[in-house]
């Protein structure tokens, strides 16, 4: 059965764009139903279950042909699905809430791709920032989103600090370079599954602090979204998509090296080339976060959504 949740959003422009028809040659002879999936970014470890299911033929087994699209703007996973220009988007729980509450955009989540948070406050080892208290007097870089501002403010308050005890600096997409060049002491918005292993691969020691261990309510990071209309009209197709995706998850869990191999086959080498060592660590991290006790892969908790809606209201991220 299709589980739907929906009440969410950095709308900064990026240079991402394009699409990839990733169906195999054997699918040409079959009568397959196309499903367009808009990613949050170029292919990376977060998408391993999707690409594994494609390469292993699980979608074809469900009568589906997957067309992966890369976003031209960072919120395309929501804007394109809500407008009926794509079937499914790969995006973030908080952005779904924001889209519904602040912009009245009719999108819903149909499944949790990564149950646990991956967004962390990170710093290089030589800064010796290991607790929120260590942020006093420090500069924290972020991508300009209201959500990450709320994360930092909540963490500071939870540690007994004032908002102005640390300085927030908008560094755009330069989360890693802003730290390595010394522009800031720490950043919020980077992923434990991407920026952390990437920096470690460059030879840096990385410390990170989890927002959900410092005042921010537990939340689901990555979800599959669609329009409310599509969820109602095409429940069977969406259910088949999720069923095949779960097969991909189970296969990667049993064969992580093969999962990495299938991901690397689908990398966008021109715009976002992947490093095997980094993605191996990334996939291992994603596997450890994709589900948790009482919350198997793809399942959704109404309590988790409700708690985060309340927190977003309390912090002013949403207004209704």
Report residues per predicted region.
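Secondary-structure end/capping motifs
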Residues: 233-317
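Short, glycine-/small- and polar/acidic-enriched structural segments
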Residues: 15-170, 181, 185-193, 209
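Stable alpha-helical elements in mature extracytoplasmic
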Residues: 46, 55, 74-77, 92-95, ...
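C-terminal motif of bacterial Sec signal peptides marking the signal peptidase cleavage site
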Residues: 3-6
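Helix N-cap/coil-helix junction residues
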Residues: 58, 64, 161, 204, ...
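Bacterial signal peptide processing site
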Residues: 8-11
């Amino acid at each position: 059965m299709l589980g739907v949740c929906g009440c969410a959003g950095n709308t900064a422009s990026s240079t991402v764009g394009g699409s990839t028809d990733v169906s195999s040659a054997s699918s040409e002879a079959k009568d397959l139903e196309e499903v367009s999936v808009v990613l949050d970014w170029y292919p990376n470890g977060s998408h391993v279950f999707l690409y594994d299911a494609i390469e292993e033929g699980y979608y074809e087994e469900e009568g589906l042909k997957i067309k992966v699209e890369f976003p031209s703007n960072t919120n395309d996973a929501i804007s394109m699905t809500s407008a009926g220009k794509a079937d499914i988007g790969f995006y973030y729980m908080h952005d779904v809430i924001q889209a519904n509450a602040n912009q009245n955009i009719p999108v819903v989540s149909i499944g949790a791709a990564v149950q646990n948070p991956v967004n962390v406050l990170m710093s290089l080892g030589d800064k010796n920032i290991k607790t929120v208290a260590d942020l006093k007097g420090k500069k924290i870089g972020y991508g300009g989103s209201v959500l990450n501002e709320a994360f930092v403010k909540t963490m500071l308050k939870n540690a007994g600090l004032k908002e102005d005890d640390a300085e927030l600096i908008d560094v755009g997409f330069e989360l890693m370079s802003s730290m390595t060049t010394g522009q800031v002491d720490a950043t919020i918005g980077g992923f434990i599954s991407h920026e952390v292993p990437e920096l470690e691969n460059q030879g840096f020691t990385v410390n990170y602090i989890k927002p959900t261990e410092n005042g921010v309510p537990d939340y689901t990071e990555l979800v599959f979204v669609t329009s409310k209309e599509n969820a109602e009209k095409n429940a069977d197709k969406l259910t088949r998509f999720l069923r095949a995706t779960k097969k991909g998850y189970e296969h990667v869990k049993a064969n992580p090296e093969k999962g990495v191999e299938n991901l690397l086959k689908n990398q966008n080498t021109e715009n976002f080339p992947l490093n095997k060592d980094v993605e191996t660590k990334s996939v291992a991290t994603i596997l450890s976060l994709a589900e948790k006790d009482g919350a198997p892969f793809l399942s959704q908790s109404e309590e988790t959504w409700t708690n985060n809606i309340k927190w977003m209201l309390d912090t002013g991220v949403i207004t209704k």
